[in-house]
Amino acid sequence: MPNYCIHGMVVRHGEAFTISDRLTVWKNGKAIYRPTVHYAYCPADVAIASLNELRGSDYQLPENQRILGDEIISSSDILGALLMGHAYNSWWTGSDLSIGESRRLVPHQNATTMQVAISVIAAAMWMIENPAKGVCVPDDLPHEYILKIARPYLGKWISKPSDWTPLKHYTNAFNGHNNPQIDRDDPWQFKNFLITDGD
């Protein structure tokens, strides 16, 4: 379970909008509560190194490209949601699929491919059984149905509390030489999650 700071990248993802939209509380036609939902992704070290090289070459793709396959010797794809700012402080729920387990299930595949592929297969099976439902987003699908198909391919299942907040491990390495914009009174403010030039 990730219980540490992850300097990930906020990636545009449909569920970031649809989950926030689904959890919005309305009163008299006006939204009185709308949670902030973000999709953050932290690539593997080798992928970050490649991204830095790409930036260094002004985003010109290299002539020779390759996708790592069987060369991957260890890793896992930890996928889930960290629900924050409630009586439990933080709660992590998700899955942890190792490269070893994914290759045991389907040789020559990696954990990310496995998680995406089984989700698509489960959704396609639901679509075949429910052709009159029209266009749906992932949140519209019955999670019990999807997980019944997907769970054997998702690795270890995790659901447990965490004492993590964005300020738990906060240190100011340039104390006295910068002015970080953090809110120590309310750790759940978005500014406490941002990594800025002032940090």
Q: Can you describe what each PLM-predicted range is?
A:
Residues 1-199:
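C-terminal catalytic/substrate-binding lobe primarily of soluble NAD(P)-dependent oxidoreductases
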